[in-house]
Amino acid sequence: KLKILGKHEEFTLYVAVAISNTLENAEEHLWELAKYVDGWGRIHLVERLSETNDPNIKHWMITEGYKNNIMYEYLALICAVTGDLKFELLKANPSPEIMQAAGEIIGALISGGPAEDINSYKDAGDVVKLYLEHSLGKDNSLNQFLILNSIKNYASNQETNWNELSSNGWTDDLRVN
């Protein structure tokens, strides 16, 4: 009955607390509930799943978890870190699903907003480089082109303190190319 109540966004946070405090295997229940909500409820649940080690939840975090009807920016960093986006992009041929999600996550991180942005992501430079390498020579969609353009605009911003961001993998070579 808690899950039924939790599917209503205005009650999701309270149900998440109740599930976390009373049910065994709470993580599985929170994940199941997160699939049914897409507003603030999803945001609250994904935040509570940020410490997961479950490979299925980690994959979901990258491919679906960041998506919400408020702002992708709220969950982009959590999902990139929890789902280990860098690891997924280190694979020789990431799936189209991973590439689309990676682009949307990178785009949200660059957009910034009220949540932590790309400057807070320790793997930012590596993830962007891998995304660019996988995108090279492909027939990119309009959405992918827009993401590539936002990467270019971000990397060419002269006002950014690139020395400070070098610890996040931003090299001069990456920014020039």
Residue ranges and their predicted role:
Residues 1-2, 7-10, 38, 156-159, ...:
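Eukaryotic alpha-helical scaffold "rod" segments
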Residues 78-177:
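Long internal repeat-built scaffold domains in very large eukaryotic proteins
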Residues 25-31, 55-61, 72-73, 114-120:
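Flexible loop/turn segments at the boundaries of HEAT repeats in alpha-solenoid HEAT proteins
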Residues 1, 24, 55-60, 71, ...:
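Alpha-helical structural signal with a strong bias for long, charge-/Ser/Thr/Gly-rich
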Residues 2-7, 28-35, 59-70:
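HEAT/HEAT-like alpha-solenoid repeats
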Residues 1, 12-24, 32-33, 43-52, ...:
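Structural detector for internal amphipathic alpha-helices that build alpha-solenoid repeat scaffolds
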Residues 55, 69-71, 87-89, 93:
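Long terminal segments
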Residues 26-29, 40-42, 58, 84-87:
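Short alpha-helical linear motifs
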